[in-house]
Structure formats: structure tokens, C-alpha cells
Amino acid sequence: MRTHSNDQDWVVSWHHSTEKPTGRAHGAAGVCLTHPGELVLISHDGDHWGLPACRPEGNEQPEETLVREMLEEACALVTGYRLLGSSRSLCIEGHERGLVLVRSYWRAEVMVQPYAPRFEVRHRRPIPAAQALNVVRDPDRAGTRVALRALREAGIC
């Protein structure tokens, strides 16, 4: 699927967990589920709700990025995880033309901690997992489609 972000055009694709797409590691995203079956979402603006995700620090492995970022962005302690797949974004027009970014998506069992917003994330919202299709919305249409695919792979919808 095509998208436009930061004055650049991208082609975004989904890859199953058995595939290893090539490109620069661009972080990890978590479909975070609590024991009572709630899905933990975050928002920067209070209007668009999505999966916690961010870039790796140093030489982190994707699993390490997942665990760190879920705690930092959603104040959620990861107790278990399973790789769902990856998104691969190829810049086809713009100053980063040719750049390929790969982000891993994980199903993560979490224990929600008291919320203390830090960094750019201002809102956290646990919702019944069954409501995910009605709530998950990224400002970017391709981002929403990838998040919904991750939810399907996680068995949410």
C-alpha cells in the first residue's frame, strides 16, 4: 500500500513472522494484552489511538526494544511475547529515496503499571479487546491498516 509521510512517498507491506524482510531496523510495536483481556493503546493527541511502538536504542534486539518501549510508552510490563510479523516501508520518492525501514510487531502479554506519561506519549487507554476495530486509528491510513493486520495476526479481530 502507498502512503505519504514527511513529504515523502512510501510503499508499505506486511510480512508474516516466518519471513525476514531486509532493511534498517525501525523498532518494535506491541499488541499489548492484559490478563482480563484488555488491549492497551496509546495516543499522542487524544484523538488517534494506536499500538505502542518506537525505534531501537543502540544495538538492541527487537525483543529488547519491545520490552523497553512498552514500559516507557504504555507503562506496561511485558511478561510474554510472540512475533506476529513485520512491516516493510520503502521510500520511493523524497530525500530518503531507496531507504527501507522494517518494524516488528508482537503480541505481548502485559501487566499495566500506574501511568506516568513521559516523552511524547500523553495518553494511555486500556479497552476491551473486542472494541479494537472501532478505536484503533493512526493519522496515516497505511499505519492503521498495518495495525489492524497485527491485531488480526494476534487473534484480536
How should these model regions be labeled?
Residues 134-157:
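Charged phosphate-binding loop/patch that engages nucleotide di/tri-phosphates or the phosphate backbone
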Residues 33-73:
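Conserved Nudix-box catalytic region and its N-terminal flanking loop in Nudix hydrolases
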Residues 56-142:
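Unchanged
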Residues 32-35, 108-110:
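Active-site beta-strand termini and strand-to-loop segments that position acidic
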Residues 25-27, 44-46, 51, 78, ...:
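Short connector loops at helix/strand junctions that flank enzyme active sites
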Residues 1-29:
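Acidic, metal-coordinating catalytic segment for phosphate/diphosphate chemistry
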